[in-house]
């Protein structure tokens, strides 16, 4: 029986790298749906709108075990992957990065300083933006939803759906939407 277990473990380990998400030079996960941009959020929003998608900023950091959990267990789920690919234009920021980011109000700062400006303290943090950002607003001020931390598939799927469907406009709080989704599944 031990040789069979050893063979099974070996096959599992051999298959694991194929399932893993690439890691960039900055130590952050790089899923295929992530966009490489100049990090001018005004341009990113215009491009997202042109594609009929919502702008989503994901703030992460090297070595973040919760970021790894999202990239290894949650984002690869076929339903969640499809929600992201079909509905979101995703830009990644490094909590401690030095790449310049230009906010909607024109302020340009390194990623790490922009994260401080927005009050981002945890990774991952997902910042969901509306299709139109009022003049003079920052991304944090304009956000329709912020999700600090790692959540399971159900909550993540529900939030992606709620934002895409403009749930924040009809007065139904996300937690109420999530509870209703869970009841409908029963």
Model features per residue range: what roles?
Residues 16-20:
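Sec/Tat signal peptide C-region and signal peptidase I cleavage site
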Residues 77-109:
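Thiol-based oxidoreductase modules, predominantly thioredoxin-like and allied folds used
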Residues 116-170:
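Non-catalytic, surface beta->alpha helical segment in thiol-disulfide oxidoreductase systems
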Residues 51-65:
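Short active-site neighborhood of thiol/selenol oxidoreductases, capturing the structured segment around
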Residues 36-55, 84:
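A short beta-strand-turn-helix
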